[in-house]
């Protein structure tokens, strides 16, 4: 018998059978796992299986090839704390949906687990006026890219190693480009936000945030969703922020 007990983040749940569900979770010590939850679709337990909830889980299976079963108990809900903040709710859904698609099964990554818990706490502390949490979300996406082998190099120019006059990011290499080098090709490059090390084009903090979202969306889509579709929650998040910040 194989089994583990651990803290988990609930990524998704799908009805299975009369009252059960298939739950997908990110475990702190064991990585992403799926398992069958008996009675998980009952009215009594439905609130436990909301995306982003922090829970304790007990997974068991006779063999490593089997799906296994999960017993899950709620520790702390996430979504109810931001129910009146639709953009933050989209961010929460985006995190869970992206992870549910791209994370390899049963490969531990405590760093991503901890980073996600911190991001959810940041979402709960945010409000409809302060959008500084979006920087945290962008850095979370950069961390995901890095942990899964697609790190962006934003600390120096890919051509001349300049560290002080960075202005762009190459979509081909994921590396920073200095202002002088990149200026003739600026229409083919991304603008590097100030909070990620850029020194130009940051007259508007809201534009800075949107430029960061454009960069991470592009590289996540290119590296993980080339043969699929970016989750609708991630697309919705970007559209909501574009609409909101363009009016501020």
Spell out what each predicted region is.
Residues 1-21, 26-248:
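Non-catalytic alpha-helical scaffolds and adjoining flexible linkers that form interface surfaces
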């Amino acid at each position: 018998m194989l089994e583990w007990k651990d803290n988990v983040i609930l990524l998704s749940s799908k009805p299975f059978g009369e009252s059960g569900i298939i739950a997908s979770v990110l475990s702190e010590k064991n990585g992403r796992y799926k398992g069958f939850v008996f009675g998980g679709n009952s009215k009594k337990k439905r609130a436990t299986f909301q995306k982003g909830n922090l829970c304790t889980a007990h997974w068991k299976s006779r063999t490593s090839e089997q799906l296994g079963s999960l017993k899950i108990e709620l520790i702390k809900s996430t979504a109810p704390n931001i129910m009146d903040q639709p953009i933050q709710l989209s961010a929460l859904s985006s995190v869970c949906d992206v992870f549910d698609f791209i994370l390899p099964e049963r490969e531990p990554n405590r760093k991503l687990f901890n980073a996600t818990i911190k991001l959810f706490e940041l979402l709960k502390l945010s409000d409809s006026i302060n959008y500084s949490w979006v920087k945290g979300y962008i850095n979370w996406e950069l961390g995901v890219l890095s942990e899964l082998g697609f790190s962006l190099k934003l600390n120096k120019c890919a051509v001349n190693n300049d560290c002080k006059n960075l202005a762009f990011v190459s979509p081909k290499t994921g590396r920073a480009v200095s202002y002088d080098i990149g200026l003739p090709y600026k229409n083919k490059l991304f603008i590097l936000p100030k909070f990620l090390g850029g020194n130009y084009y940051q007259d508007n903090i809201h534009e800075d945030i949107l430029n960061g979202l454009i960069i991470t969306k592009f590289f996540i889509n290119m590296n993980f969703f080339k043969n699929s579709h970016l989750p609708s929650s991630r697309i919705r998040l970007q559209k909501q922020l574009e609409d909101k910040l363009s009016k501020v």
